[in-house]
């Protein structure tokens, strides 16, 4: 008995579509950051591609739901990190305070499942802010924009792949 199962046609399409969507997100954001900021946007490309992969789910409904959760978690991190970085230099202690505050906000919003998104975004923002203190306050703005682009490309990519595949097969779109 084999542990691995033979991939279906949809499994192959899904894999290629997700990879393509992630590469598109990465490319779009690296080019946008380079055009706007005048330097490589590797972190922006990375963050957009991660957001795309995060929302590329098994069904269109799950993909949209993941996109909403990702956006809420990122917005909470943005709302906490931006004013903090306007007023106080980035530090590990500050990151800890923001992580606790973000977790509490997500609990109050009854979005327990999205705490990890808020935490991951906060960690990335604060670590990059520590590495580049001169532009620290820009990090929440960049990560919010990267996330939105990644979500849009990921959800759209999933919906397009599902529509094309299931329409071609004459089956209900999932």
Task: For each feature predicted by the language model, list its residue ranges.
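Alpha-helical transmembrane segments and their membrane-interface boundaries
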Residues: 1-174
């Amino acid at each position: 008995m084999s542990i691995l199962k033979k991939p279906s046609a949809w499994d192959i399409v899904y894999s290629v579509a997700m990879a393509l969507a992630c590469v598109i997100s990465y490319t779009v954001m690296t080019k946008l950051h380079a055009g706007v900021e005048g330097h490589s946007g590797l972190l922006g490309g990375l963050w957009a591609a991660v957001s795309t992969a995060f929302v590329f789910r098994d069904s269109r409904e799950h993909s949209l739901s993941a996109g909403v959760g990702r956006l809420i978690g990122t917005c909470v991190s943005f709302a906490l990190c931006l004013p903090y970085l306007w007023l106080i230099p980035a530090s590990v202690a500050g990151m800890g305070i923001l992580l606790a505050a973000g977790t509490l906000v997500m609990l109050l919003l009854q979005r327990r499942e999205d705490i990890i998104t808020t935490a991951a975004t906060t960690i990335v923002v604060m670590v990059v802010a520590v590495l580049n203190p001169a532009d620290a306050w820009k990090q929440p703005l960049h990560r919010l924009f990267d996330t939105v682009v990644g979500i849009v490309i990921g959800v759209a990519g999933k919906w397009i792949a599902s529509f094309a595949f299931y329409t071609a097969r004459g089956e209900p779109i999932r």
